[in-house]
A protein has these predicted regions:
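Short structured motifs
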Residues: 30-36, 94-100, 121-123
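HotDog/MaoC-like acyl-thioester-processing domains
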Residues: 2-13, 104-105, 115-161
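Hydrophobic beta-strand-centered segment that forms part of the acyl-chain substrate-binding groove
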Residues: 77-116
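Residues located in well-ordered beta-strands
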Residues: 35, 97-99, 111-113, 137-139, ...
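Hot-dog-fold acyl-thioester-processing enzymes
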Residues: 53-75, 88
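Alpha-helical membrane-targeting segments
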Residues: 1-31, 53
Length: 161
């Protein structure tokens, strides 16, 4: 585990620091109203609410907002493992596949539970200096617990020399 993970967690679980983090690093997520509901080394849950700001012409959540929340659910786990790491580690989304199952209306929670996989891949990149690619799944569920979308996000990480 990244020795600086808890420092990162303290930033993003503090509501004021998290809003500043979004405004400076991910302004679109700030304006879409994304928030963190749960965060640990293993799991990240991102909350997004269907509203006038996040809707499409069909009165459901715009797909790009769903993609942003899904990517953030896995991305926060990746970012927590690369935060202040020495050597520094680059992180990049290289592919995204999605199944939209149901109209996204109301509050949607995107969950990624791939923290252990992420830690393993980053540690291997540090050990051998090679880029690693891996898929993280982020599942969006509505307030009734029904799946609205399943995103498979392919990340690439590489320890810099």
């Amino acid at each position: 585990m990244n020795p600086h993970f808890n420092s990162f967690k303290n930033i993003i679980t503090n509501p004021i620091k998290f809003k500043f983090f979004l405004l400076t690093k991910l302004p679109a997520a700030f304006f879409a109203g994304l928030s963190i509901k749960e965060f640990s080394t293993d799991k990240s849950v991102i909350r997004v609410k269907h509203s006038w700001w996040t809707q499409n012409p069909f009165r459901s959540m715009y797909f790009a907002v769903e993609a942003m929340a899904a990517e953030m659910a896995s991305g926060m786990l990746v970012f927590g493992q690369v935060y202040k790491r020495n050597p520094s580690i680059s992180m990049l989304v290289v592919k995204m596949e999605v199944d939209f199952v149901k109209k996204a209306i109301g509050i949607i929670l995107f969950t990624c539970e791939e923290g252990q996989k992420i830690q393993t891949q980053i540690n291997q990149s540090i050990e051998d200096g090679e880029a690693k690619t891996f898929i993280c799944t982020s599942t969006g569920k509505n307030e009734l617990g029904e799946t609205v979308a399943v995103f498979n996000i392919t990340w690439s990480v590489k320890a810099k020399k």
